């Protein structure tokens, strides 16, 4: 890649956005940001606490502001929160300010990757995790597809392999 375009990773929880994003940024010598971690830095609290205190709407407002600021930077890799695409403004900014890579994964892989993670507020509910993930997929997958420049399935692949696939696809476009 001659010029350093921003690379924005979207997809459901458990798709590997943060892990793959760090790997990708390292391989491309770019700065890496994770929108959830940025929110935690700015609030001094974890995402679960923000959800509990401010509700999902309050969290999404913070997320939209953070993503707006980060996408104004140049030459970054950004792992977005799974629900960030619910905001039309965020979708528009991601599309306009960089290359959007949709990291796709199955519900089974999401369950396996998130089952012991207590930092997933949307899974800390009474409903069975599979039902929650299926409902989120029905709502969000069309939004990921709407803005994706590239789609890559992450099931059964290491972060390094997926990062290499992304680099190859970006270089061939």
UniProtKB/Swiss-Prot annotation:
Cofactor(s) essential for the protein: Mg(2+)
Organism domain of life: Bacteria
Pathway, per record: Metabolic intermediate biosynthesis; chorismate biosynthesis; chorismate from D-erythrose 4-phosphate and phosphoenolpyruvate: step 5/7
Coiled-coil region list: none
Gene3D superfamilies assigned to the protein according to its UniProt record, in alphabetical order: P-loop containing nucleotide triphosphate hydrolases
A single Gene Ontology CC term: cytosol
Binding residues annotated for Mg(2+), in chain numbering: 18
Residues binding substrate, per UniProt: 36, 60, 82, 140
Binding locations of ATP: 14-19, 120, 157
Keywords: Amino-acid biosynthesis, Aromatic amino acid biosynthesis, ATP-binding, Cytoplasm, Kinase, Magnesium, Metal-binding, Nucleotide-binding, Transferase
Cofactor comment: Binds 1 Mg(2+) ion per subunit.
GO terms classed as biological process: amino acid biosynthetic process; aromatic amino acid family biosynthetic process; chorismate biosynthetic process
PROSITE patterns from the UniProt entry: SHIKIMATE_KINASE
EC number: 2.7.1.71
Protein's cellular compartments: Cytoplasm
GO MF annotation, one: ATP binding
Enzyme class: transferase
Predominant subcellular localization, coarse grouping: cytoplasm
Assigned protein family: Belongs to the shikimate kinase family.
Function: Catalyzes the specific phosphorylation of the 3-hydroxyl group of shikimic acid using ATP as a cosubstrate.
Name of the molecule in the record: Shikimate kinase 1
Gene: aroK
């Amino acid at each position: 890649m001659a010029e350093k375009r921003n690379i924005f990773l979207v997809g459901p929880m458990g798709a590997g956005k943060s892990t793959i994003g760090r790997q990708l940024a390292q391989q491309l010598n770019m700065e890496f940001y994770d929108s959830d971690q940025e929110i935690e830095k700015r609030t001094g609290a974890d995402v679960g606490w923000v959800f509990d205190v401010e509700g999902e709407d309050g969290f999404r407002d913070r997320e939209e502001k953070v993503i707006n600021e980060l996408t104004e930077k140049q030459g970054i890799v950004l792992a977005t929160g799974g629900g960030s695409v619910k905001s039309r403004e965020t979708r528009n900014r991601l599309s306009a300010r960089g290359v959007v890579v949709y990291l796709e994964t199955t519900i089974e892989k999401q369950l396996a990757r998130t089952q012991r993670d207590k930092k997933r507020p949307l899974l800390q509910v009474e409903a069975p995790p599979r039902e929650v993930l299926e409902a989120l997929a029905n709502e969000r997958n069309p939004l990921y597809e709407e803005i994706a420049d590239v789609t890559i399935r992450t099931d059964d692949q290491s972060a390094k392999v997926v990062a290499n696939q992304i680099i190859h696809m970006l270089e061939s476009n």
